[in-house]
């Protein structure tokens, strides 16, 4: 921050949604690059893989934590991808593909997914994921 000189690294991504190989290699490059920093890291984005899959485990089993689970208070934790559809069918799994990941040195106070629809319309095909953090 300008006030106290605190430095951190914020990286954002949108991994490929069609090619599993591109997604796998993209994540590997991100993690390899991010772990080189001595400063705290915040890695955000549309990762195009679901919570619990192998890539999610790779992302969160090392130096990064999913802010949803690191948060002192989880205000909501719903679906992050809507595809502009108001209802998820019973046989469709929740589509949580957007994450805020943090390294040591980052405290997550709150986490939430903002699932409001102004005027009943989706402003995007993704809901905003918000974390209040301290570095």
Language-model-detected regions and their locations in the chain:
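Soluble catalytic domains of enzymes that build or remodel membrane lipids, polysaccharides, and related
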Residues: 1-7, 16-33
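Non-catalytic surface loops within mature trypsin-like serine protease
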Residues: 17, 103-105, 135
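Active-site beta-strand/loop signature of hydrolases that rely on acidic residues for catalysis
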Residues: 9-13, 27-55, 67, 101, ...
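Structured beta-strand-rich core segments of catalytic domains in phosphoester-bond hydrolases
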Residues: 1-11, 15, 99, 107, ...
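Extracytoplasmic/periplasmic, Sec-exported soluble proteins
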Residues: 18-22, 47, 89
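Active site of divalent-metal-dependent phosphoester/diester hydrolases
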Residues: 49-123
């Amino acid at each position: 921050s300008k006030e106290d000189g605190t430095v951190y690294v914020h990286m954002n991504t949108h991994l490929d949604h069609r090619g599993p190989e591109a997604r796998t290699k993209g994540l590997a490059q991100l993690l390899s690059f991010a772990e080189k920093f001595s400063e705290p890291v915040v890695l955000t984005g549309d990762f195009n893989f679901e919570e619990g899959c192998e890539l999610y485990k790779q992302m969160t089993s090392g130096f990064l934590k999913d802010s949803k689970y690191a948060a002192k208070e989880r205000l909501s934790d719903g679906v992050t991808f809507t595809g502009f559809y108001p209802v998820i069918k019973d046989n469709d799994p929740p589509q949580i593909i957007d994450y805020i990941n943090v390294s040591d040195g980052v405290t997550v106070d709150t986490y939430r997914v903002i699932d409001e629809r102004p005027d009943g319309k989706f402003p995007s095909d993704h809901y905003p994921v918000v974390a209040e953090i301290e570095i």
